[in-house]
Regions:
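Acidic, polar-rich low-complexity tracts and alpha-helical solenoid repeat scaffolds
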Residues: 4-411
Length: 411
C-alpha cells in the first residue's frame, strides 16, 4: 500500500510537470504562430505593392509619382481579404497585446491597397488611439492616414496628419523614409514642387528599397529639370541611364541626358549625332518619334528653327508614334506657329492635339483648358488680321489692290 501511494505521488508530480510544459509549449506555439502570421502578412503587403507597380502602365515621359496608387475601388480582393482575416485572428485573441497594434496597421494597409480608403482610415484611427505604449506606430499611422485622405480628396486634413507624423517620428530609417515620402507625396499632389524636393531627397537618403530608389531618382530628375536646376537633373538622369532599370526608364533618361548635355558640344549637329545613332539601333524600334522630337528640341535650343521644325514634323510622320509624343509635338508646333502669328496653321495643330490627347498626359486638364481658350484666341487674332488686310486693301488704288490680291492668291 505504501508503495502504491509513493507511485501515485510520483505520478502527480509528473502530471504537474507535464501540464507546465504543455502550457509553455502552447505559449511558444502561439507566439510562433502569431509571429508567422505577421511576418507573412507583411510579405503579402510588399508583394501587393509590387503587383500594383507592375500592373500600372509606365510612361516615363510623364511626371512620375512618389507612390503607385491602387487601381481597386474597395471591392473584394482575394489576397488582401485573406490577409485581413489572418490579422483579425491576432486582434480578436488579445493574448499578446504587443502584436495587436501591428495587426491593426496591417489591416489598415491591406484595406488601403485594395482601394477601401475609408475603411483603412478607421483602422489607422484605432491604431492612433491604442498605440500609447508602442509609439513607434504613431508616425506610420499618421502618414498612412495622410495618404488615404489624399485619395478621397481631403487635402487639408491630409496635411495635418503628415505633419503629426513628423511630430512623433523616431529613429527608424524605414519610418523616416516613409514619412518623408508621404510629405513629398502630399506637396506634389497640391502642386508645390519645389517644396517637395527636399523631402524626397531625405526619403531617398534613408531608403533601402530598390524599387523606390530608382523611381524617386527619376522623379527628382524630372522635378529638377522642370524647375530649371539642370545640373542636378543631369546627375540623376546619368545615374539612371547607367543602372539596371526597366528599358523605358533608361531610354527616357538617356534622351533627357542628351538634351541637358548641350554645354559639352560645339554644335547642335554634334549633339544630335548620338541620337541619330540611336535611330539605327534595333532595340529602339517604336521609339523613333521620341528620338526625332528630342533632336528637334536640341536644334530649337540652339536657335536653328528650320531644322527643329523639320525634326518635329519627322516625329509626327512616324507610323508607330505614341499618342503621348504626338500630343507633345502638336503642342510644340501649335505654340511656335501661334508665336509667328500664323494663326490658322497654329489652330490646325491645336485641333490635332484633341484627337490624340491621352488621359494620362501630364497636366491633362490644363492642356484641355488651353485648347479651349487657344481656339478662341486664334479665331480672334485671325479675324483681326483679316480686317487689317481688308483695311489695307481698301487704302490702295485699284491697280495696287489688284496686284496685292493676285499676290495673296499665288501664296
Amino acid at each position: 500500500m505504501l508503495g502504491c501511494k509513493g507511485v501515485k505521488s510520483r505520478n502527480n508530480a509528473f502530471e504537474r510537470v507535464t501540464v507546465e510544459e504543455e502550457k509553455e509549449y502552447n505559449f511558444r506555439q502561439n507566439f510562433t504562430s502569431r509571429y508567422n502570421i505577421l511576418y507573412n502578412a507583411n510579405l503579402m503587403l510588399e508583394n501587393e505593392e509590387r503587383a500594383i507597380f507592375q500592373g500600372t502602365s509606365k510612361n516615363f515621359q510623364i511626371r512620375q509619382s512618389v507612390f503607385d496608387e491602387p487601381i481597386g475601388d474597395g471591392d473584394a480582393h482575394q489576397l488582401m481579404d485573406s490577409l485581413i482575416q489572418k490579422a483579425y485572428k491576432i486582434v480578436n485573441s488579445k493574448q499578446e497585446s504587443k502584436y495587436v497594434n501591428e495587426a491593426y496597421l496591417i489591416i489598415g494597409k491591406a484595406n488601403y491597397l485594395k482601394g477601401a480608403y475609408h475603411n483603412s482610415i478607421e483602422f489607422f484611427n484605432h491604431l492612433l488611439r491604442t498605440a500609447e505604449e508602442q509609439q513607434e506606430y504613431l508616425p506610420l499611422a499618421y502618414a498612412w492616414k495622410s495618404r488615404a485622405l489624399l485619395q478621397i480628396g481631403k487635402t487639408e486634413i491630409a496635411n495635418k496628419m503628415v505633419d503629426s507624423a513628423f511630430m512623433t517620428l523616431d529613429d527608424s530609417k524605414a519610418t523616416r523614409t516613409f514619412v518623408n515620402a508621404a510629405k513629398a507625396n502630399y506637396l506634389l499632389r497640391i502642386g508645390q514642387e519645389l517644396e517637395a524636393i527636399p523631402y524626397l531627397e531625405y526619403a531617398l537618403e534613408s531608403n533601402s528599397k530598390t524599387l523606390d530608389k530608382y523611381r524617386w531618382q527619376f522623379l527628382l530628375a524630372q522635378l529638377y529639370k522642370d524647375n530649371g536646376q539642370f545640373d542636378k537633373a543631369l546627375t540623376y538622369f546619368n545615374a539612371i541611364s547607367k543602372s539596371n532599370v526597366p528599358f523605358d526608364m533608361a531610354f527616357e533618361a538617356s534622351l533627357q541626358r542628351s538634351l541637358l548635355q548641350g554645354g559639352k558640344y560645339d554644335s547642335a549637329d554634334e549633339q544630335v549625332r548620338p541620337l541619330l545613332r540611336m535611330l539605327r539601333e534595333g532595340k529602339n524600334d517604336g521609339y523613333q518619334d521620341q528620338i526625332l522630337f528630342q533632336a528637334g528640341q536640341i536644334y530649337e535650343q540652339k536657335d536653328d528653327i528650320a531644322k527643329a521644325l523639320s525634326y518635329f514634323k519627322k516625329s509626327l510622320a512616324q507610323p508607330n508614334r505614341s499618342n503621348y509624343q504626338a500630343t507633345e509635338t502638336y503642342l510644340k508646333l501649335g505654340d511656335y506657329y501661334f508665336g509667328e502669328k500664323q494663326y490658322v496653321v497654329a489652330q490646325n495643330y491645336y485641333d490635332s492635339v484633341a484627337t490624340v490627347l491621352p488621359a494620362d498626359y501630364t497636366d491633362v486638364n490644363k492642356v484641355r483648358r488651353k485648347l479651349g481658350y487657344m481656339n478662341e484666341i486664334t479665331q480672334l487674332y485671325a479675324d483681326i488680321a483679316r480686317k487689317d488686310t481688308l483695311l489695307y486693301l481698301a487704302s490702295l488704288d485699284e491697280q495696287g489692290r489688284g496686284e496685292k490680291v493676285n499676290t495673296y492668291a499665288n501664296d
